[in-house]
Amino acid sequence: MELKLKTISKDGIPEAISKVELYRYLNEPEEAESICHDILAADPDNQMALRLLGLTLTDQFEGRHPDRYAEAEKFFQSLTSPYDRLYYRGLLIERRAKAQVKAGVPAHNLVGSLHEAMRCFEEAEKIRPPHNDDAMLRWNRCVRLLEKLGNPPVEQSHTSLHDDDTAPIEIMRRPGGRAAK
């Protein structure tokens, strides 16, 4: 038997979208992801499928690398609406931070991410469609999460890198470097 993906019909896309939503509700993001890929194979610019695919990837975040962040970001950035691009970028950042909280990442490492998510939500709020308060709801969730974390200060690194800096391994390979002795 030949293993070859089958292409769904464009007429079947609305039902396939419903199945994606169902599998997300059932907490089966891999199933939802597979269907999103099938929809996009039939209609590569389908905005709902792009949104849902990005969301199914964020549903799989566990707070460790690799978490498919860049892949989800690519799908969200391909949305045509400026509002959607800002809103879903904020949601992407927020969901990654929440996954990292659950994975035990120190709170001070997440403050910057949550502030960046809030910046996205604030910009999205300015251009939101009428009667759409989603960006404000997400902003409020970030505020509550920061309050729960105690709003720790962002840890500042005193290390600065410059264009001419060399990786430590390269220094060790140079004559007179530690490895050369």
Give the residues covered by each predicted segment.
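Alpha-helical segment of the N-proximal tetratricopeptide repeat
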Residues: 11-35, 103-104
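Terminal, low-structured helical/coil segments at or just beyond the last alpha-helical repeat
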Residues: 2-4, 126, 131-181
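N-terminal interaction modules that seed assembly of large macromolecular complexes
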Residues: 25-61
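Amphipathic alpha-helical repeat scaffolds of TPR domains
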Residues: 10-15, 43-57, 81-103, 133-145
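Structural marker of alpha-solenoid helical repeat scaffolds
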Residues: 42, 78-79, 127
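Repeat-mediated protein-protein interaction surfaces in helical alpha-solenoids
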Residues: 1-7, 30-38, 69-73
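TPR-adjacent "capping" and linker segments in tetratricopeptide-repeat scaffold/adaptor proteins
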Residues: 1-14, 77, 108
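Short coil/linker segments at helix-helix boundaries
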Residues: 57-78, 88-123, 148-162
